[in-house]
From Swiss-Prot:
GO cellular component terms, semicolon-separated: cytosol
Name used for this protein in its record: Isoleucine--tRNA ligase
Species, as recorded: Pseudomonas fluorescens (strain ATCC BAA-477 / NRRL B-23932 / Pf-5)
Motif placement: 'HIGH' region: 58-68
Gene responsible for this protein: ileS
Compartment(s) of residence: Cytoplasm
Binding-site residues, Zn(2+): 906, 909, 926, 929
Binding site for ATP: 611
Main location per the UniProt record: cytoplasm
PANTHER family: ISOLEUCINE--TRNA LIGASE, MITOCHONDRIAL, SOLEUCYL-TRNA SYNTHETASE
Family matches, as HAMAP family: Ile_tRNA_synth_type1 (MF_02002)
GO biological process: isoleucyl-tRNA aminoacylation
Enzyme class: ligase
Key word Transit peptide present: no
Length: 943
């Protein structure tokens, strides 16, 4: 038997079938570094339009987790796709370096007896060490960026820039000193930002407390009575017994109705709607003897249960009827609403009672409870209330309560003297900060769109921003306060610039080491140099000023404004929020044109990642077992607008999908063996109809993909590329052209036409996958034929694809119809194979019984129809002649019948043909193969 293998154009490529990503990816990273890929991208991008994605800085503490990986991969996919779309898209990674978590780590390692200078020195060293570790982990994910020159909020230039940003806000009239309740952590010994607050379940004692009336005549008059027949009290309900010693007022809603209830021994004032539930709770019987609106109770005095002072009634619309009594006890030092209401009624700061010290212990001067920690004092307060006959009810409930994100301990609101950015304070010029920010939100694009309403609600309802902290490791608030008046120095903005210049040279240490006389001279004795530091959200929230404008200038025509900020959905109250406020205060616009938020990672059951649950997916492990490209493919395939499910099984499915894409790429490369685009590329008009369709289909898909990349819909990119590889290529086109590729002459038009199409498809595909499969795309790039530069990323979307003319006879709709027929034939072939009626498809002969229109269309392929259907013969017959055993199909006007061919099998092309053995020199092969080996070669027109 003659071996005809040498006469075939068998596929051949060195591109490995097995990816070996964990081993191969580090080699590719090394190559990117050696060729200076990021620098080359900046060079070719010089004259391109700029696209700036400003990096929200991760905190420089600990190894990266899967959430970090998602965030950086999404950013990288955008940077890469924008680069391929013809933009200059730099990416400068950043790190958030100051703040309590690092200070806490240093204290744990080195003890708490460090000097402030030692603390700052050790914090700086610790942050630097953490950055290097995280940097290596981010690079391993394939993230392109200026890793040699990242921005760090602790860089001297950025510390100085932050002081200058604060100076701009002082100059604009947004900054003020005030006494206000802020989130306070006893363990931190400092105020916390809203974004540093977590909510966890906490058990608390609820108490219903009676405050005896002091103005009996006024209370009687409010209820339309001449006098009160017996003792009366108003009842409050609270979950914070520890605040009762600081009670200074009682709040009722002006529009709610309140009832005077006779319970036998005394009269109780309760919200009318809650009388029944309250009496049941107190195990009392009673009757309503009069009602009055809350507004009638205004300024009536009641007595504190155990201190000799009065508590007046103030009207407040935040009072609710959801629980309690409809009366709220007001401790202005420990509640924001309480504080605002008491101030509205004229209470001055010096009159606000604030017995809780920074460590959570009552001042020793507090009667009954001095020196006690507030949480431990709760039972003693309940006992005292019971002792004086004021306690009507107590029980323990579990409720959601604010906790410190670092220490996981309960927080309180506590009034302290702090520096604030005023939301509604009238600035030196223009609208208030709240007005500016709300307008800026309207001018910003949001992905997903619901982010706009979320951020709008937060800004509309947020209090003034407390920007001061009482810590060592932070950018200083370089203010001098007059010792007598407490006012800022009149030259504050000018002095801040002098401080910034020193910080630029020496870092924040310059301020803390500085003597006031160095700047103030003889005036120094009149001023206090403050030691407060800035909230870390002010650090990252001003990077648009000191990074985009300063150390890494990427400004647009309107100043430092990024095209995109991209972070997790928690950043609506974090970085997006603080950046918006500083941007609007300084530049009167948001520092971003568009905001993109992604959800959090959960396991396949929707549970949060937790070591105790054993469901943590570590990106480092994924890199070492599957490869970063698998993780990148999973990110691309997941709709990031909601929770992002990940598990070993989910990643394995991504690995399976990766193999299908890789195998498609390998098939393309292996069939481009011997193809030189410089000499073998055919013009579109010389290509076979099917090949022209394949290139046209690729062009249409590329247009869709460019749109999806532009709208950051990576899951659509993934699904369309995957389907293209599996269905249109693997399930249709590539199957059909195998015969032509392998059996026709090596340099025949039929083969070169297919190779031209494969080349165009490969050039497009390698670019499509480059933003997602960053490593694999560059590996594939090296194996493509023809002269090319060092990386796929140094190019733009492929421009060599051609569109089918509108009048092309075998156009898009035509091939869609053919595909439907092929699906129907394949379905029946599968049935026949399962029944052992035929072996492979090429053992089959198919007869298509078609209506006239369909028959005419299929007839256009002439004798090449069999190559499209991949059967040894394909015959057409009128639909009316279909025998009873013909199979109906889902294609209208088509029935078909498959039988096993009676003809011998060609040893070369494996088709069963009547003319096998006709040629005496080649008794084992068909006439077509003889012609392809020793004759002029077959001529194909369509497929």
């Amino acid at each position: 038997m003659t071996d005809y293998k040498a006469t075939l154009n068998l596929p051949d490529t060195a591109f490995p079938m097995k990816a070996g990503l964990p081993q191969r990816e580090p080699q590719i990273l090394q190559r990117w570094d050696s060729i200076g890929l990021y620098g080359k991208l900046r060079e070719i991008g010089k004259d391109r339009p700029k696209f700036v994605l400003h990096d929200g800085p991760p905190y420089a503490n600990g190894s990266i987790h899967i959430g970090h990986a998602v965030n950086k991969i999404l950013k990288d996919m955008i940077i890469r796709s924008k680069t391929l779309a013809g933009f200059d898209a730099p990416y400068v990674p950043g790190w958030d370096c100051h703040g309590l978590p690092i200070e806490h780590k240093v204290e744990v390692t080195h003890g708490k007896n460090l000097s402030s200078d030692q603390t700052r020195e050790l914090c700086r060293a610790y942050a630097s060490e953490q950055i290097e570790g995280q940097k290596a982990e981010f690079i391993r994910l394939g993230v392109l960026g200026d890793w040699a020159n990242p921005y760090k909020t602790m860089n001297f230039a950025n510390e100085a820039g932050e002081i200058r940003a604060l100076a701009e806000m002082v100059k604009g009239g947004f900054v003020f000193k005030g006494l206000k309740p802020v989130n306070w952590c006893f363990d931190c010994g400092s105020a916390l930002a809203e974004a540093e607050v977590e909510y966890q379940d906490k058990k608390s004692a609820t108490i219903d407390v009676a405050f005896p009336v002091a103005d009996e005549a006024k209370l009687a008059g409010a209820f339309g009575l001449a006098k009160l027949a017996k003792p009366a009290a108003i009842v409050i309900w609270t979950t914070t017994p520890w605040t009762i010693p600081a009670n200074q007022a009682l709040n009722v809603h002006p529009e709610f109705n309140y009832a005077l209830v006779d319970t036998g021994e005394r009269l109780l004032v309760l919200a009318e709607e809650l009388v029944e539930s309250c009496l049941a709770r107190y195990n009392l019987e009673g009757s309503v003897i009069a009602t009055a609106p809350g507004s009638a109770l205004e300024l009536i005095n009641f007595r504190h249960p155990f201190y000799d002072r009065l508590s007046p009634v103030y009207l407040a619309e935040y009072v609710e009827l959801g629980a309690g009594t409809g009366v709220v006890h007001s401790a202005p030092a420990y509640g924001e609403d309480d504080f605002v209401t008491c101030k509205r009624y004229g209470m001055v700061n010096d009159d606000i009672l604030n017995p809780v010290q920074s460590n959570g212990v009552y001042a020793t001067s507090l009667e009954f409870f001095g020196g006690q920690f507030i949480w431990k004092a709760n039972p003693a307060i309940v006992d005292k209330l019971s002792e004086v006959g004021a306690l009507l009810h107590t029980e323990t409930i579990s409720h959601s309560y604010m906790h410190c994100w670092r220490h996981k301990t309960p927080l309180i609101y506590r009034a302290t003297a702090q520096w604030f950015v005023g939301m509604d304070k009238q600035p030196a010029a223009g609208d208030t900060l709240r007005q500016r920010a709300l307008q800026a939100i309207e001018d910003t694009q949001f992905v997903p769109a619901w982010g706009q309403a979320r951020l709008h609600s937060m800004i509309a309802n947020r209090p003034d921003w407390c920007i001061s902290r009482q810590r060592n490791w932070g950018v200083p608030i370089p203010f001098f306060l007059n010792k007598e008046s407490g006012d800022l120095h009149p030259r504050t903005v000018e002095l801040m610039e002098e401080v910034a210049q020193r910080v630029e040279q020496e870092g924040i240490e310059a301020w803390f080491k500085m003597d006031a006389a160095e700047l103030l001279g003889d005036e120094a004795a009149q001023y206090d140099k403050i030691s407060d530091t800035l909230d870390v959200w002010f650090d990252s929230g001003t990077t648009h000023w000191h990074v985009l404008r300063g150390s890494h200038p990427m400004g647009h025509e309107s100043g430092p404004r990024a095209d995109l900020y991209l972070e997790g959905s928690d950043q609506h109250r974090g970085w997006f929020h603080s950046s918006l406020l500083t941007g609007c205060a300084i530049d009167n616009h948001a520092p971003y044109r568009e905001l993109l938020t992604h959800g959090f990672t959960v396991d396949e059951n929707g549970r949060k990642m937790s070591k105790s649950l054993g469901n943590v997916i570590a990106p480092q492990k994924v890199n070492d077992t599957l490869g970063a490209d698998i993780m990148r493919l999973w990110v691309s395939a997941t709709d990031y607008s909601g929770e992002m499910a990940v598990s070993d099984q989910i990643l394995q499915r991504s690995a399976d999908a990766y193999r299908r894409i890789r195998n498609t790429a390998r098939f393309l490369l292996s069939n481009l063996s011997g193809f030189n685009p410089a000499t073998d590329l055919l013009p579109a008009e010389d290509m076979l109809a099917l090949d022209r369709w394949a290139v046209d289909r690729t062009l249409l898909l590329q247009r869709e993909l460019e749109l999806h990349y532009g709208e950051y819909r990576f899951w659509n990119v993934y699904s369309k590329v995957h389907n293209f590889c599996v269905q249109e290529l693997g399930g249709f086109y590539l199957d059909i052209i195998k015969d032509r590729q392998y059996t026709t002459g090596a340099n025949s038009k039929a083969r070169r036409s297919a190779q031209t199409a494969l080349y165009h498809i490969s050039e497009a595909l390698v670019r499509w996958i480059a933003p997602i499969l960053a490593f694999t795309a560059d590996e594939l790039w090296e194996y493509l034929p023809g002269e090319r530069n060092e990386s796929v990323m140094l190019n733009t979307w492929y421009e060599g694809l051609t569109e089918l003319p509108a009048d092309f006879e075998l156009g898009r709709e035509y091939w869609e119809g053919v595909m439907a027929v092929k699906v129907a034939v394949n379905k029946e072939l599968e049935v026949q194979r399962a029944a052992k009626a035929v072996g492979g498809n090429l053992q089959a002969e198919v007869t298509l019984f078609a209506e006239d229109g369909l028959a005419a269309d299929l007839a256009k392929l002439s004798n090449e129809l069999r190559f499209v259907l991949i059967t040894s013969t394909a015959s057409l017959a009128p639909f009316a002649q279909a025998p009873a055993d013909a199979v109906a199909t889902e294609v209208p006007g088509l029935k078909l019948k498959v039988v096993k061919s009676a003809f011998p099998k060609c040893a070369r092309c494996w088709h069963c043909r009547e003319d096998v053995g006709v040629h005496p020199e080649h008794p084992e092969i068909c006439g077509r193969c003889v012609d392809n080996i020793s004759g002029a070669g077959e001529v194909r027109h369509y497929a």
